[in-house]
């Protein structure tokens, strides 16, 4: 083995160890914080059961066209997979929460590893969300919007989950900035960039 080959092998091992450590760190934090929460959607539950870590961005529409659209990345061992998943919640439509409505999406491993590193560095599992109320904590009374979509960040392990949500996060971040919401938008934008999809509402 040449010196160059040796150095390359050391770099590869170091990168792998770093990614594994980040995954372990995120999983440990989520395991502790999210033990009392459950997942109602059977498709998301299946992803949880079949992977070590699931990270997802969901756009939730509950006003006119009731639906949830997910962009998902999932890690099992050292492999990442991406998915697009849409659930139609309209009563006069067939139930959409079935395996056939989840579609694989190409994802870049380096980008997924970078997202995991970002989540670890920023401790994104501590994002609180607005819980459907108190959208503008600074009391800006001119900051109002109706019938907008909500957004949710899912970080799921086999033992727990965190899933902070914000109503119209881009709108409210513009008129009354909030540190947690800004981090939420930063993380979910990275997920959108990784799982390229056409036609998902923001």
What residue ranges belong to the model's regions?
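Function-determining sites in protein domains
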Residues: 20-202
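Bacterial Sec-dependent N-terminal signal peptides
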Residues: 1-29
